[in-house]
Amino acid sequence: MTQKTFVSGDVLTASDVNTYLSHEGGAWTSWSPTWTNLSVGNGTVSALYYRAGRLIVWKLKLTFGSTTSVSGAIRFSLPVAASTGIEFDNTFGTFVDATGSRHFSIAQSISTTVLQANMVNSVGGYVVQVVTSSTEPFTWTTSDQIFYSGAYESLA
């Protein structure tokens, strides 16, 4: 969706309203996240977002293939840079093991363009974030999945 700046004297049309004020915000756009400590290999990624003004709504799904691998804390890039000072600790996801077990996850903001996928665990009666690795929250293998979705204010 192309951004439009309205100036004095412009006429707001039905098309403008549908494009800029609707919760639909236009068509979903795909993006290719940049991964850190994760090699997609022959896995499949579906990463989509839409923009409504400065609001970015996004969703991400990664299904592991036989050559997908994890070597440390999983990080991925956002589709559009976030406004400075925004924390993403309210972005939730799920890690799904090929056996069917599901693990709740929270994405931690590393920068305005990168999130880190952390698992959630209970330690001493408290819920804490735990960094992912090749064996956390489980040993990653073919058909495992990572799901995330979120919304945030873009930088521009």
Language-model segments: residues:
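Surface-exposed molecular-recognition determinants
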Residues: 3-4, 8-14, 18-156
